[in-house]
């Protein structure tokens, strides 16, 4: 059984992202990893949706969780007629897809794929939950393999012995970038901004880098400019929650200011991922506003006085003039020429 997660860090292995088995989905709680290794156990697809909304898993984790949630929904309705099962799964598709507004279109593609697998299983009389899980694993294999192709275009852009700055947690591309670098005999060091308020850079990106044997340093979110100036950063790279066809990149809030700093110091910014055909322009993206209370604390410890207000946009938009290239599985594209990515019929 081919597994594209082979050789990657613990938290990037499929079962340690999200996994369905016997009427339950377990999701690694990335809010507390690596201090604690705990899994949130969901007994219904609605609980999976809520776990995604509550940031139990982040970056690309929600897409795996969503697929496993669809398998769980199939288990929930297994005693119903075929027509009733299909109706139940269509409703679950909408529920899970709407977990977070900014990523709705990508999430809908994932859930629709699970729905198609369910329809085929119903026609063939196979267990629908297992068919969806098999589809989810195959989809993960395809995605990981696709990201591995992205890594093959990204790693040559990094000087051997150089310095890379990241942002938030790019999930699979972080692991694949490091795996590809090791296979090609290239070494570099990484600076990871901590990424408040959930500290994904400090807890997730830095842990993956360390687990895979790389020199990694965590910095606070207000240090990128200083570090770029003093530590000879060669490249800033991040993944994206959406890459609009007009060249705007939607990613974890803070990406814009790092790209501005990189531009100021003449450091290239490379964004990894495929353009989103569902987002012709940035105007089709809804920026999620989350509970502002989270900006008034750090890992559960209150840092601001009672009565002080918080402000918490989950994402920001980086304009194309700040981006040196979009690194895809088909090569590196100018952010001003993303329609060319689809010229091959993809």
Question: Predicted regions: what is each one?
Answer:
Residues 10, 14-124:
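Long amphipathic alpha-helical segments
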Residues 31-34, 39, 43-52, 132-137, ...:
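Glycine/charged-rich beta-loop-alpha catalytic/anionic-binding loops adjacent to active sites
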Residues 40-55, 154-156, 298-307:
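Short, hydrophobic/aliphatic alpha-helical segments
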Residues 54-69, 103, 165-169, 312-327:
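Conserved phosphate/anionic-ligand binding catalytic regions in large, soluble enzymes, centered on
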Residues 106-160, 186-188, 192-236:
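Ligand-binding beta-strand-loop-alpha-helix segment within the catalytic cores
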Residues 173-183, 259:
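Histidine-anchored nucleotide/phosphate-binding helix
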Residues 195-346:
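Conserved phosphate- and dinucleotide-binding cores of soluble alpha/beta proteins
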